[in-house]
Amino acid sequence: LRTHDCSPEALAERRPQLRLWDADINDTLPTLDCSDYMNTDAGMRAWIEAIQRHGVVLLRGVPAQPGQLLDVARRIGNVRPSNFGEYYDVVSMPNPNASAYTAMGLELHTDLANWNSPPDVQLLFCIKSSVRGGESLFADGFKVATDLRDRDPEAFRLLSSHPMDFRFHDDACDIRASAPTIVLDGEGRITRVRFNNWLRAPMSLPEPLIEPMYAALGTFWNMLRDPGYHLNLRLDPGCLIAYNNNRVLHGRASFDPTTGERHLQGCYLNL
């Protein structure tokens, strides 16, 4: 009976204890050594607990070579392929089909918002980084959404009640989805954040909702851009950061590709 106790206290005890964060995480970012993660149960457990609680964890000491990313990912589970392949190389290239493959700065976003079920975890692994610029940026979407609920309840209600449309299309595919920016469970707890202005399509909502929805979205976006919420991190070769793609938004500063090399690899997995 204790195992199946459904009292509020028992349910709360079984539920993962989230630790919402803001810019203070720059001093307390969960960080692990790659060898501990790869070779010990304690290291793997620490990685999983960091993802569950903070939504983000940094690995140091990964051999800075192509292919290491998938070894790290498969320590946890099966890699989830996307329309970009089993993994992808984040480099500046001519005629890109995604903004990640440019040198421009990227605003905070979650990946694959145009999928009905975006992947749970994203991994980014630095192989080379000698360019000027290109620092990574992260924010806890659950923290920002929680603060939005306190500051502007109507904006929160709109973004959690009405869907946004997302679309990615190129010569090979056309993938679309529709979902709220903030997803709640049956008790009103925030369970997902889906935000990507690169993939956001025109709204398909009743006309009276269009202006209020844009205003609510703008309020949320302005909060996301507040440096008080930001984790700022320069990924050096051998560093691999993993984060909950349905909670933690990521972006980057622009960089000058003429000043050196920048080569990251990324992939996705579900927990």
Q: At which residue positions do the language-model features occur?
A:
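Structural motif
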Residues: 61-63
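Active-site environment of non-heme Fe oxygenases that use a 2-His-1-carboxylate facial triad
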Residues: 16-56, 66-271
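Short, structured interface segments
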Residues: 1-14
